[in-house]
Amino acid sequence: MDTAEIRRRFLNHFSERGHTVVPSASLVAQDPTLLLVNAGMVPFKPYFLGDLKAPWNRATSVQKCVRTVDIDNVGRTARHASFFQMCGNFSFGDYFKAEAIPFAFELIVDGYGFNPDDLWATVYLDDDEAEAIWRTLLPAERIQRRGKKDNFWSMGVPGPCGPCSEIYFDRGPAYGREGGPEADEDRYLEIWNLVFMQFARGEGSEYGYEIVGDLPARNIDTGMGLERMATILQGVENLYEIDISRPVLDAAGRLTGTRYGADPDSDVRLRVVADHTRTAAMLISDGVSPSNEGRGYVLRRMLRRAVRDARLLGAREPVMDELFGVVRAAMGPIYPELVDQAEAITAVAVAEETAFLETLRTGTTLFDTAVTQARSSGSSQLSGESAFRLHDTYGFPIDLTMDMAADAGLTVDEAGFRRLMERQRQAAKADRASRRIGNLDLSAFRPILAASGPTTFTGYTELGRESGIVGIVGIGDGDSLTAAGEGEEVGILLDATPFYAESGGQEADLGRIRFDGGEAEVLDVQRPVPDLVMHRVKVLGGELRVGADVFAEVDVERRRAVSRSHTATHLVHTAFRRALGESATQAGSLNSPGRLRFDFHALGAVPDSVLADVEDEVNEIALRDLEVRWYVTSQEEARRLGAMALFGEKYGDRVRVVDVGDYARELCGGTHVASSAQLGAIKLLSESSISAGTRRVEALVGMDAFRFLAREHVLVSQLSSTLKARPDELADRVADIVGRLRDAEKELERLRAQAVLAGSAALAAGAEDVGGVALVTAQVPAGTPADDVRLLALDVRGRLAGRPAVVAVVEAAGAAVVVATDETARTRGLRAGDLVRHSWAALGGKGGGKPDVAQGGRGDADMIPKVFARLRELVADQSA
């Protein structure tokens, strides 16, 4: 039975039993505590927590999931994978154990054809009800009771929890010993977990918490791994060999010249390549881009591990382009976004692969040096400093360094690496924390939402309105408050608001909230939970109270400026897609007053000619005074109309479409101008790379663009006057001047070197004999560049060829010293680095270097005689 059929039967089974089929949510979790969706219930979490009322009593889904906690086991076991699909059925206060258990059993036996004699069930230690239900389906000897660790589910924090029941398939004596799941979980494979959410848990350790009460409603959350079920039904040894995974595995073998099944170690690497490639494709299709933080780092790690293992298996050419094509063919029928965005998805992967291959080429040399140093010092550990340098200079993720070190038989000082990383992050982290709402305790918002309902947003049609305060929370701790006085910063929630909360790349509205006896300044607007808008305010006077009537007033000029930027972003997006192709999709944006930042997918730098064409096109569209209108329609109708959906975004059944005439049509929830003429001018400022496969354009809009162009005009006029050239001649005139200046600098450098070396012969001739070593000590005028000091020292050393020689040249103010030794002197133990350290550095300066030449600085003029005397002593002692 192929995977598509297993999936179809699952959804049909529950649809026929009154469940609404819910499409898979994006892998990008909406839950702020998660980077990625890692379980089938995650999209339903607000309903289980009571934050929102579920729109259905029963639901079923096949949810995309990524889990990296066991990444080191990927490829090594039959059941670990970083990407998987979780089939689930859910009840929100409707049915419970008496229905959930038979629902699952019927599908397994009647739908998938399992022999009931091969099935086992486990229940929680005290769950008599679940065991009684199972006894109507299975003999008592194939039902086992297990403790909290195995059969009691919680989210790890105070909240919903409950016992669970797991269904196991007995693979037979060839896979292990008898005795059921508690005896051998390799033989008895878990295929379905049924969670009965009925209690609330309190604080405590992973398994040491207390049950503090019953939930208002009893819920069902179940999960059946699609890939694991396919492994059994297709009769293969592991989930890498099922119908949607095997083609990727085979392609990896072909591209690396490795036959799967020939060598256990090679098989592990092939499975890693296949698994990580599939995971990466799914992440990119949901809008994740490679980066060094968060979910972007997860993606980068996956791609780089896949590329490295492919290289170790023998790949000599890039492999991602072809592997992604195989993933697309295998998974595209279920996930059409893989096909719709094929070019853009592959471009991201290929760009990251190209960048990483260069990283491997340059960084491996440093890594090999670090390994040699560790071994020569008798250590079995790579230093944290080396790991940090590999990360900071060459972009080596720490896990890659650890993998490579393990291959070399070494460990890594991970704690030392983390300390250096933390030190580097502190300043940026503190700055970010001070600029955002903070990590609020979201529990304060649940009673507000339950009592008052969702915040009504009216800002599409009005910029001021009367409203009522339904809640006040403390900033930082999220504590629920009843009032806030002058000077306090708090979060307030209104029953309706014209303020746009930051989202979709558009900055939040600012403004004022006025009330009887005072007013508050709105500093930020966010959505801490779905359906609630929180206004971060500073009370300027009076006292805000829950229940008070207020007038919410948006800063009109700022809103208009932000709206201009947002509409301009739509034009820029369309223009780049027209110029570069459909793969130039948006990867991110920021719309602020008078300025926009637009990130898009592209393999390389955009030519200046294309940037000029894009700028011309968007300004021409602005001048055409096209109507900008918005409307709400079904997602299906929006796609039929050709509306552009942003790469990686997920939309509901009803979507808001924004049209700019017949030029641009995009799904968007932001605010916009009424016509393109209101944009004024659009001026592209820069184009740059922000990561492999992603480019960034920054632009000014409206009066900000006009002011910039006016300043540019004044500057051009001044340059034309100064250089006595017409504006169209300025580039050639400046290039000519720069060329002549460069020639003059080269000549000056030649003359300066000639002057510095003028006394070289005399210095060599006057060398002092110290124990058979020619010692030269010399000063050069204050202000002589360090490079010239070095040049003189090396030239004098060259003139003393054939004699053991030590040459020390010092800039008269003590800013630079260079010591050079010849090979014969070094055989006597006179190494330049040691001489600098024991003379210059020992007397207060800074310095060191290699055995043949070393350099120092940060000294003063008074040190120089002492340094020369110390050098004589060192040479004499070593020559004795």
UniProtKB/Swiss-Prot annotation:
Residues annotated as signal peptide: none
Top-level taxonomic group: Bacteria
Cofactor binding mode and count: Binds 1 zinc ion per subunit.
Listed cofactors: Zn(2+)
Pfam family, one: tRNA_SAD
Broad class of where this protein is predominantly found: cytoplasm
Entry annotated with the keyword Kinase: no
Catalytic activity from the UniProt record: tRNA(Ala) + L-alanine + ATP = L-alanyl-tRNA(Ala) + AMP + diphosphate
Hydrolase as UniProt keyword: no
Keyword set, alphabetical order: Aminoacyl-tRNA synthetase, ATP-binding, Cytoplasm, Ligase, Metal-binding, Nucleotide-binding, Protein biosynthesis, RNA-binding, tRNA-binding, Zinc
Amino-acid positions noted as binding Zn(2+) in the UniProt annotation, renumbered to this chain: H566, H570, C668, H672
InterPro entries in UniProt: aa-tRNA-synth_II/BPL/LPL, Ala-tRNA-lgiase_IIc, Ala-tRNA-ligase_IIc_anticod-bd, Ala-tRNA-synth_IIc_core, Ala-tRNA-synth_IIc_N, Ala-tRNA_ligase, Ala_tRNA_ligase_euk/bac, DHHA1_dom
GO MF annotation terms: alanine-tRNA ligase activity; aminoacyl-tRNA deacylase activity; ATP binding; tRNA binding; zinc ion binding
Top EC class for this record: ligase
Subcellular location: Cytoplasm
GO cellular component: cytosol
EC numbers, comma separated: 6.1.1.7
Domain notes: Consists of three domains; the N-terminal catalytic domain, the editing domain and the C-terminal C-Ala domain. The editing domain removes incorrectly charged amino acids, while the C-Ala domain, along with tRNA(Ala), serves as a bridge to cooperatively bring together the editing and aminoacylation centers thus stimulating deacylation of misacylated tRNAs.
Function of the protein: Catalyzes the attachment of alanine to tRNA(Ala) in a two-step reaction: alanine is first activated by ATP to form Ala-AMP and then transferred to the acceptor end of tRNA(Ala). Also edits incorrectly charged Ser-tRNA(Ala) and Gly-tRNA(Ala) via its editing domain.
Name of the featured protein: Alanine--tRNA ligase
Protein's gene: alaS
